[in-house]
Amino acid sequence: MNLLILFFGYLFGSFPSGYLAGRIAKGIDIRSLGSGSTGATNVLRHIGKRAAIIVFLLDVFKGVLSILLAKYLLLNDSWQVAIGLSTLIGHIWPVWLNWKGGKAVATGLGIFLGLSWQVGLATLGVFIIMITLFRIVSLASVSASLALPLIMFLSFSGSNISLPFLIVSLLAMLLVIWRHRENIVRLIRGKEPRIGQP
């Protein structure tokens, strides 16, 4: 039963919201433009603000939904984390799109809002601060992912620490950094575009 739920978690994550936005709004394949990502940032740059907001909310919802399902079924922390990871993997490597999906940020946010809304909101706060200061989405995304494990650790007190939650925060951080490796190179070179730039 739990393995079946992992499969459905992957299917939730692999729902191609950004790809569908491109096809419906402009008849384009968003994967062929810009970063090639199906995430909200690439949608914003090549389709528009309204489509980007919808894609962002749908991607967050995918993460939240998978964790809420796990909690509804009274699954323990380890299984909640496993389902969250399967959803994140589905978002990054969707079978429907030849394994080419998003960069794990919005769906990752949804997963951590589901696991611990306080951690999710605090991590979102880091993103908002960085995007306000620098107006570079990738910098804000990487900064928030780096802060995530520390925020998760600080959210627990004493013996109340959930090892699965800490592990998944580290894995999510690594996935986000890996998916942004090209952005990081451009950041180092000072060539990463800000919001409003192509």
From Swiss-Prot:
Residue spans crossing the bilayer: 1-21, 53-73, 79-99, 111-131, 136-156, 158-178
One Pfam short name: G3P_acyltransf
Membrane topology per record: Multi-pass membrane protein
Localization annotation: Cell inner membrane
Alphabetical GO biological process terms: phospholipid biosynthetic process
Pathway named in the protein's UniProt entry: Lipid metabolism; phospholipid metabolism
Keyword presence, Ribosomal protein: no
One Gene Ontology molecular-function label: acyl-phosphate glycerol-3-phosphate acyltransferase activity
Keyword Transferase in annotation: yes
Primary localization class, coarse: membrane
Domain of life: Bacteria
The EC number(s) this enzyme carries: 2.3.1.275
Keyword set, alphabetical order: Cell inner membrane, Cell membrane, Lipid biosynthesis, Lipid metabolism, Membrane, Phospholipid biosynthesis, Phospholipid metabolism, Transferase, Transmembrane, Transmembrane helix
Enzyme class: transferase
Entry GO CC: plasma membrane
InterPro entries, sorted: G3P_acylTferase_PlsY
Catalytic activity: an acyl phosphate + sn-glycerol 3-phosphate = a 1-acyl-sn-glycero-3-phosphate + phosphate
HAMAP family to which the protein is assigned, alphabetical: PlsY
PANTHER family found in the cross-reference section: GLYCEROL-3-PHOSPHATE ACYLTRANSFERASE-RELATED, INNER MEMBRANE PROTEIN YGIH
Function in brief: Catalyzes the transfer of an acyl group from acyl-phosphate (acyl-PO(4)) to glycerol-3-phosphate (G3P) to form lysophosphatidic acid (LPA). This enzyme utilizes acyl-phosphate as fatty acyl donor, but not acyl-CoA or acyl-ACP.
Quaternary organization: Probably interacts with PlsX.
Family from the record: Belongs to the PlsY family.
Protein name listed in UniProt: Glycerol-3-phosphate acyltransferase
Source organism per UniProt: Prochlorococcus marinus (strain NATL1A)
Taxonomic lineage: Bacteria, Bacillati, Cyanobacteriota, Cyanophyceae, Synechococcales
